[in-house]
Amino acid sequence: MTRKNTTTNPWAKFHGPNLGYVIEQYDLYVTGAGSVDPELQELFEIFGAPSFQDDVVTGDNTATHFSPQNTGNIEKILKVVQLVEQIRSFGHTLAHINPMEDAANGQSLLERAMNELSDADLKAIPAKTVWQDAPEGIHTALDVIHRLKEVYTQSLAYEFSHIQDSEERAWLHQMVESNSLRQPLSNQKRTALLKRLTAVEGFEQFLHKTFVGQKRFSIEGVDMLVPVLDEIVLEGAKNGVEDVMIGMAHRGRLSVLAHVLEKPYSHMFAEFKHAKIEGAVANSGWTGDVKYHLGREQVVSNEEVSTRVTLANNPSHLEFVNPVVEGFARAAQENRKKSGLPEQDTSKSFVILVHGDAAFPGQGIVSETLNLSRLNAYQTGGTIHVIANNAVGFTTDSYDSRSTKYSSDLAKGFDIPIVHVNADDPEACLAAANLAIQYRMLFKKDFLIDLIGYRRYGHNEMDDPAVTQPQVYKKIKNHPTVRAIYADQLQAAGVLNADEIETITQFTQEQLKSDYAQVPPADTSDATIHVKVPDVVAKGIQSIDTGVELDSLRAINEGLLSWPEGFNVYPKVKKILERRKDALEENGKIEWALAESLAFASILQEGTPIRLTGQDSQRGTFAHRHIVLHDTDTNETYSPLHRLPNINASFSVHNSPLSEAAVVGYEYGYNVFAPETLVMWEAQYGDFSNTAQALFDQYVSAGRAKWGQKSGLVLLLPHGYEGQGPEHSSARPERFLQLAAENNWTVANLTSAAQYFHILRRQASILGTEAVRPLVLMTPKSLLRHPLTLSTASQLSEGRFQPALEQENLGTKPNKVKRLVLSTGKMAIDLAAEIESGKHEYNLDEIHIVRIEQLYPFPAEKVQSIIKRFKNLEEIIWVQEEPRNMGAWHYMAPILFELAGDKVKTGYIGRPDRSSPSGGDPFAHKAEQELIVSHALDVKYNFRQDKLEIEVFSN
């Protein structure tokens, strides 16, 4: 028998979904139709049925008495509770968020659920029973449903149910369900919004009529993108944000430049007209780029606040700008002027990424970049994403470009709140923008706005979109612009009259005409055809003394081999580190990893911050670096580079996610925005770097020539043929050499630890100067501890980087030398090892070997001076481990021909052309390598052909 207790009522604490659960359990308890939670069963026995008697005030202000005691009421309450949650979760399916489509037709699951309850049923249930935080004026469940439908099924639609954090989810629902998000705008702000839309539309239409047929990738159809960006930037500035970084593609970019970044109309028109105008500051390099790829930096302000806005330069490779801009933001957030890890303040900057509706689900770089958003090494405290959704990608409809309902669905997997908004409802768009910036500033996480509009013209202004989308373009042709729609709304609301609206339009037109009149005639001279590389770039990097005093190196080494008392270093690692103890003494030898650590420490002591990331970079792919130690008992980490004395710069080394493209883009962006920092990206194996090829092609190699965007990024690409197959042999140096021109970067393949030490220090010395450029290093694997790559302390304390090195003990009898062998990296060490082994007899008096340490720019003067010593030279040979169609041969061949002149032959020794970089059989590899070495050292071989083994030929 039920024991009722009338003194305490625990059921009053339950509301909404929790109430629904209790009612459902009580129904099972009464009917015996299923198992009941034991704790609830005990409460039912003590307190009886959930009693929520209340006076319900209906719409006609009459009070009715409601009690859920009977089973029928229990079922109705449960259905209402479920309906409330369904509206919150699936209201977006009924929302009118696409201006080119009618509102949902009522056939959805949600609509059917609504039809299961009559208005009378809903009027009988108190609002508080199903919505604990029901605002004032909401009395019944019918009021609740009407209110929630108004919130969730109009021109704003929300997807929050996938958010895992209950606090965030509750905050989001509270924000949209309360009146705080959709407070009526003041007449002043509504008028300003109309003026902004008039400027955007007027600018685009002026371009359309004035520069007929010229590509501009119009914003029309998603015009509200500009006011949305305005709102986010302004609200960010009010929150004290110092830098707002924007990444976007070409669609709408010119309007964003002109309005959000305040680029003068006259400067925009001059670019279309190909005219020179006074005051225009070139934000491009010596080759330049099309106008809708260029970026801009501008301090944007109003009467109260200001902030710096940076629109990143961007290629047409969609979405690849995303990680670059994230790198900008992290660099702006970090203080790198103290030892240890940099200090990050995510309130100093944030990112806005404008995506395309086809590119967001289509480009893998998007998900790679989203994956960075919560990682310690890459998070920037939240990015605001805006999909400029015009429902078509060039000529491809959405049903052919994605497998999901919405273009934004990818974001759900990363726990990102999503708001869909009709781009024809300006005030709803601003509400979405406000929610986005508030969420980002409060929770420090990403937020996405799906701005759904259309594309008024074709992909570019020369396309006829009706060819491929005839029906929708019939609609678009007759569809009013968002400016016209909003103007009518303001006129109907009495905010402005027709004359005032016309005055706004005329003012915009007069401003455009006036600015166009300032543009001089087109510059038809051909002077710009002759591109001139800046002298400081053309001269290359000057020779720099990069030695460090021996006492300083010894002190550094002592610090590198120290760790806090009680810190338990893994025994195997401890043994590796202890081997380095005497490396700088008289008979000591310095291996590659120690040379790197010594270089890092000395660079830090000179005030240059360092950031190194890559897969497994803390330990090193080949268990060589050990720059971060792990306590075997606590798993705490410690880096000696954080505790060395006399350091006034930060050091960070991070293991990256299993991504190349996003991480390379991020590190490039970080370095561009923090030019004083030595930023390094390390591939796990150089073979895998080609998944970031678009970043190498579009940014790292060409960014300065196109945009004047300087970078000193270092790429560490493990390279070397050791019989490990086609995925663990080649960093594809041929590709970096193919991109090499105009001294755009340095490409090197080194043969000693000292050379690595000096080139790192040289790179650090040019950071933040006009001489800066990226450094591409083919780094060793098997050579990391090879005896012939070890260096002495004096080789670090004295001298500088040498672009070319002569093999010791060769060429001592210049008149006898007939063959000059040029090689690089591991191939050069293999030749040296064969000579040192003494296994075979060679006439070494007739041969000399030069190691080309710096492949680009090629050290021509140095090599020429060597050649001049050998009066009887007959042949210059390039020897490489890669197949002939790969490696450096096709880059080196014309250089060799020029060096040799008319009397000296040139030749190649190496593997023949192959489609795969390496074979998979280690025994075959070894046999081939031995043949290459023996043929290179055997002067008598004299260029015989042996196609089955290796390829040897001359000119």
Curated annotation (Swiss-Prot):
SMART domains: Transket_pyr (SM00861). Its cofactor is thiamine diphosphate. InterPro entries: 2oxoglutarate_DH_E1, 2oxoglutarate_DH_E1_bac, DH_E1, KGD_C_sf, ODO-1/KGD_C, THDP-binding, Transketolase-like_Pyr-bd. It catalyses: N(6)-[(R)-lipoyl]-L-lysyl-[protein] + 2-oxoglutarate + H(+) = N(6)-[(R)-S(8)-succinyldihydrolipoyl]-L-lysyl-[protein] + CO2. Transmembrane segments: none annotated. Belongs to the alpha-ketoglutarate dehydrogenase family. PANTHER family: 2-OXOADIPATE DEHYDROGENASE COMPLEX COMPONENT E1, 2-OXOGLUTARATE DEHYDROGENASE. It comes from Bacillus cereus (strain 03BB102). Signal peptide: none annotated. The keyword Nucleotide-binding does not apply. The lineage of its organism: Bacteria, Bacillati, Bacillota, Bacilli, Bacillales. The keyword Transport does not apply. It holds the Pfam family OxoGdeHyase_C. Its EC number is 1.2.4.2. It comes from the Bacteria. GO terms for cellular component: cytosol; oxoglutarate dehydrogenase complex. SUPFAM superfamilies: Thiamin diphosphate-binding fold (THDP-binding) (SSF52518). GO terms for biological process: glycolytic process; tricarboxylic acid cycle. Disulfide bonds: none annotated. E1 component of the 2-oxoglutarate dehydrogenase (OGDH) complex which catalyzes the decarboxylation of 2-oxoglutarate, the first step in the conversion of 2-oxoglutarate to succinyl-CoA and CO(2). This is 2-oxoglutarate dehydrogenase E1 component. Keywords: Glycolysis, Oxidoreductase, Thiamine pyrophosphate. Coiled coil: none annotated. Homodimer. Part of the 2-oxoglutarate dehydrogenase (OGDH) complex composed of E1 (2-oxoglutarate dehydrogenase), E2 (dihydrolipoamide succinyltransferase) and E3 (dihydrolipoamide dehydrogenase); the complex contains multiple copies of the three enzymatic components (E1, E2 and E3). One of its GO terms (molecular function) is thiamine pyrophosphate binding.
